[in-house]
């Protein structure tokens, strides 16, 4: 039985650090249809599978509410604790080296007062999603975030405080762990229309740290968007939901941010704020 099938029940939310307070958020991981098979960082290009990471996930995949993606359409699924690194928690080589889109999904039970009190502001906070994430709540595109090291959040009150009032909330997160040459990513890229099949390119002059090449092969012998990622750093690229997910509430008037201004008195060296 897949995680998608077992996840259809109503989970009980207990104490812990996972989504909604559960010790381990039950998720389903989609590792086939939305990406490529994993290839070794040192495997020759000629043996690599087609790889491509669109900057925006094709919306045709989610024209219907996300529960419709379960079952036959979801592909292979596994239970995954949150927070954790999906590619470091198992023992399989394929999962450990997977690079592309993966899917998390969890259904949670809403507190009745959250639904009925229109003055309650409900926020979904994601501590870390490495590296590029798109979040849906009840099938609605809610928030996107790029950069896997900082938290982000979204006010989701309007998504369920409407008639008919739902009793459950379906949270779906698509994460892509490809490290691309964008400014906030790590590593340069190489574009060459004349590369020979089987070529592995060395790192460039490393404008960012850590250095590694993302090699795009746009020649006629490759599918559109084909690339090979060769990691040359000496640590593992942990990916997935690396920190906890939280649902919390605030009143309509709330503190959004705090700025502390400090200074030093020149005559005494005394600090103040």
UniProtKB/Swiss-Prot annotation:
A UniProt-annotated Pfam family: Glyco_hydro_2_N
Gene3D superfamilies on file: Galactose-binding domain-like
Region span, Disordered: 1-20
GO MF, one example: hydrolase activity, hydrolyzing O-glycosyl compounds
InterPro entries: Galactose-bd-like_sf, Glyco_hydro_2_N
GO BP terms in the entry: carbohydrate metabolic process
Record-stated family: Belongs to the glycosyl hydrolase 2 family.
Protein name as catalogued: Putative inactive beta-glucuronidase protein GUSBP11
Species name: Homo sapiens (Human)
């Amino acid at each position: 039985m897949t995680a998608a099938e077992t996840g259809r029940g109503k989970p009980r939310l207990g104490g812990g650090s996972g989504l909604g307070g559960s010790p381990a958020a039950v998720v389903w991981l989609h590792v086939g249809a939305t990406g490529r098979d994993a290839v070794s960082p040192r495997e020759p290009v000629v043996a690599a599978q087609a790889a491509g990471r669109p900057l925006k996930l094709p919306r045709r995949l989610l024209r219907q509410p996300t529960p419709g993606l379960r079952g036959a359409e979801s592909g292979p699924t596994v239970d995954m604790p949150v927070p954790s690194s999906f590619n470091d928690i198992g023992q399989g080589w394929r999962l450990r080296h997977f690079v592309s889109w993966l899917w998390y999904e969890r259904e949670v039970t809403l507190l009745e007062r959250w639904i009925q009190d229109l003055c309650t502001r409900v926020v979904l906070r994601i501590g870390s999603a490495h590296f590029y994430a798109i979040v849906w709540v009840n099938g609605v595109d809610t928030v996107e975030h790029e950069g896997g090291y900082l938290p982000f959040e979204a006010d989701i009150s309007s998504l369920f405080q409407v008639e008919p009032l739902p009793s459950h909330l379906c949270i779906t997160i698509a994460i892509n762990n490809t490290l691309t040459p964008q400014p906030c990513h790590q590593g340069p890229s190489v574009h060459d229309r004349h590369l020979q099949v089987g070529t592995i390119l060395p790192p460039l002059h490393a404008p960012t740290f850590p250095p590694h090449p993302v090699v795009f092969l746009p020649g006629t012998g490759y599918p559109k968007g084909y690339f090979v990622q060769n990691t040359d750093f000496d640590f593992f690229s942990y990916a997935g939901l690396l920190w906890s997910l939280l649902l919390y509430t605030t009143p309509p008037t709330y503190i959004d941010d705090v700025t502390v201004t400090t200074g030093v008195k020149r005559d005494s060296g005394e600090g103040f704020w």
